[in-house]
Amino acid sequence: MRVAPEFYEFLRNRINISDVVRQKVALTRKSGNYVGLCPFHQEKTPSFTVSNSKRFFYCFGCKAAGDVIKFTSNISGLSYNESAIKLAIDYGIEIPKLTAKQKEFYEESDEILNILELANKFFRTQLTPEILHYLHERGITEETVKEFSIGFAPKNNKFEKFFHDKNIDIIKLGKAGLIGKRENGEIYNLFSNRITIPIRNIYNKIVGFGGRVLGEGLPKYLNSPETTVFQKSETLYGEHKAISSSYKKNHSILVEGYFDVIALHQAGFSETVASLGTSVTENHLHKLWRAGDEIILCLDGDNAGIKASIRTINLALPLINSEKKISFIRLPSGLDPDDAVNKNGADFFAKLIDKRISLSEMIWHIEYSGKSFKTAEEKANLEKNLKNYCSKISDSDLKVSYYRFFKDQIWQNLVTTQKKATTKNSNLAPIISSHGYSELEILEHAFCALLVKFPIILEEKDIRDFILNLNFNNKSLEEFRNWYLNEIIDNNVEASEITAIVEKTSFFDIFLLLSKTDNLFLDISFNKNNIRLDLLWQWLHKKYYLINLQQEYAITINSTDNHDFEKVLLYKKEILKIANELQVLNESFINHTIT
């Protein structure tokens, strides 16, 4: 009885793999997964792990790995299809009958798979010493040639004769994606004079080929056309080998080419896969995330690689969250992954993995590095582009984190760096001379920004008194606060006249910094028409109170010989209370203002 591959996925989702495994293995819960003694080899220390969330098992000892169907197959000795049927019967799951059209489809698929397997056997027999020498020159060992079933498609008619002798006609070869048709109607071997690299699906079945031209010729690389069994948007080169390693290491490495995958596998990075001459798709990302929580992209550093990175970033942003991540390896100029590992060794590439950057860091690198931001228009365009990236993130918490990250980068790389040279003798110098800001200093800036942007808030006597009596750590800001209240607010200066007045004073740099539309000291945009000043003030006031509470708590702990535990407890209780209130305000205000 044949079942559709879609039913395999249904079983993986329906049946907890741990429920099936514990019928044969005593499992113990550990770090969200299960561990036990491997049923496939003798061991005294448990190295067999099972993950319900990833629907996967893996043995660190014998390397056995797979899904719930594969486990049943390994235990029972049944085929994969037979194991799926057994699981369905055991769990009372109805097996959908194939329609006549489905039967025809799967019969054709089986025939194509058989033809592709035959083609690969033929290509393997055509390897010559010259081709093996070429592969060895590329750093590929004879063992790796065998492991990846690398072959060669000759120019002569041996290919056609091979299949003719097996009574396989041109039509069937066409359905398998093995032949092409010239404009004059001539039929030819699609991979003629090319090194052949079989492409296998997750079940280790050959579904197509990649071909690398021998010598000069275009295109240099060629893939099988899409067929009944081969869809580029679904398939990743090397996935049949990589999935178990990805599960073990909790990450995958995604590269561009076949030889990148082969070189990295040979060097020990068996979690590597490649997209097949097409852009990365959502299907690719979800497939890799099922095996590991992080996808590490390692693309060429040229313009094409940067463009591919941008496409992948835009695709991934709506899909990522705090658990499912994307990161990037930045290769040295002129190197692709194949070169990186063959010329510099496995240790060099391992260090590149260790130095990988996050998706947010890659966005900043793409938008900032090597560009000029001298004009207001250039800076505005940078902020516009960064906000556009943030807007694509579906996870609200992550969206806020990205927004804050970019705000911090703008501050560190644009404001601080560009103003240092021109403000050594101004009141801004004490602000930007520090390498970082304490939370209290950031709040001082925020209070002053509020004063500049929303003077209407001073109509509330309590708020005016608070700001007026605030004792600033940064004395330059305190002087600005005093001057601004006395000269601008108390004299009811019109908004249109303020800049001209401040420009004549030593406070102009501070004024420019604080009056930016997008305030650098808060995760908000002041150009929002619907900004809630009441919530903003509550947030600032509570944050200020919390910081002072924490400082008093620290002083109490450090200065009391025999701690006044009752006092300490009161501080802890109040700190927790205010922190919770701030969290509520964060959700109702900060998230609201960046959407």
Swiss-Prot record:
It comes from the Bacteria. GO terms for cellular component: cytoplasm; DNA-directed RNA polymerase complex; primosome complex. Its cofactor is Zn(2+); Mg(2+). Residues 250-332 form the Toprim domain. Binds 1 zinc ion per monomer. PROSITE patterns: TOPRIM (PS50880). GO terms for biological process: DNA replication, synthesis of primer. It is an enzyme of class 2 (transferase). The keyword Oxidoreductase does not apply. NCBIfam families: dnaG. Belongs to the DnaG primase family. RNA polymerase that catalyzes the synthesis of short RNA molecules used as primers for DNA polymerase during DNA replication. Contains an N-terminal zinc-binding domain, a central core domain that contains the primase activity, and a C-terminal DnaB-binding domain. Monomer. Interacts with DnaB. This is DNA primase. It comes from Rickettsia conorii (strain ATCC VR-613 / Malish 7). The gene is dnaG.
